[in-house]
Structure formats: C-alpha cells, structure tokens
Amino acid sequence: VMFAHQSTEAWTTLCNSILGARMNITGSWPMDTEMANRSLGLAAAALESSVTVSCRPSERNGFETFKRVKKAIETKVTEEVNALYELGFRGADLLTACFGQAVSEFGKYETVEKADGSEVTVGELLELARTAAFNALLRGFDGDEYTRFYIGWLQMNGIGDTDFDDAAKFARVGM
C-alpha cells in the first residue's frame, strides 16, 4: 500500500482498515515519491514522500496485556528508528514509518487490554509508536517539551534552512 498521509487520523483509518480485513502490517518504509521542483497551486501543500506499507493475512492469538505489547512496540520501534537513521532517513517521515512496526506487534492479537480491562485503540497505539520513535532519537534525553522538540529537530534535520511544510509536518507528527 502506498500511503501519502502524515496525520495520525489518516493512519488510524488505514490501520483500522488493514486490521479489520484480518491483515497485519509486516513493514513500512518512507520513499521519496515527489519531485522537489514541481509546481504547486495557490495555498497547496507539498508532499515530499509516501510510506510504503506491506501487509499479509494474519492469524491473531487471543489477547495480550498492554504492558507486554507496549514493551514489544518500544523495542521494535527503537530498532527501526536506529536502522532507518543509519540508512539516512530523517524528518517526520522517519517517525511516521515506525507506525507500521508498532501495528505489526499490536496486530498479532485479537485484543490488547489495559490493566482496567479496556481495549487499547489504534489511536493510542500510534501515539505510543510516535513517543517510542521520538524517545529512540533522543536516546534517553530528559528535558522539557520545547527542549525535546528542539533536540529531536536537530537529530532529524540538522541546522540550516527548512521548508515551512517540513517544519509544520514535524510539529504535527514529531511529538
């Protein structure tokens, strides 16, 4: 599946559709799919990349606790961030590509339950994935929200000029 949205709402819809079709995500990778010098209409937003999502039919195993799935997601997302970062991926697409890895863990089970017995939603899962990816970039740095944003930005983009659309996308997706 080629997916070009960065918003959590769009990802929630995609993941719910995949899981609802008894499929599971096996991987997700950012790909540059747009030309940098293309023309844009008035007030149009520019998309720089898409995420390729691979899926396969899945057999789900009963239920699992959120505590165990959370640990598995944090481990898998950290590994994915490190691998993609080493390959040169940066920007909000690096964080977004980790959504697929989180869903692959979550999708192994019919339900994932919190300690109070309520089910974990895909939206909550994606928030966990975003946090795990961002924490992997910060490698344990503990600071206030603005400092974490700044350090995360530097990790992914370095110092220099940045297109407004890139900064806006990171602000929406990156924290």
Language-model features and meaning:
Residues 1-175:
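S-adenosyl-L-methionine-dependent nucleic acid methyltransferase catalytic domains
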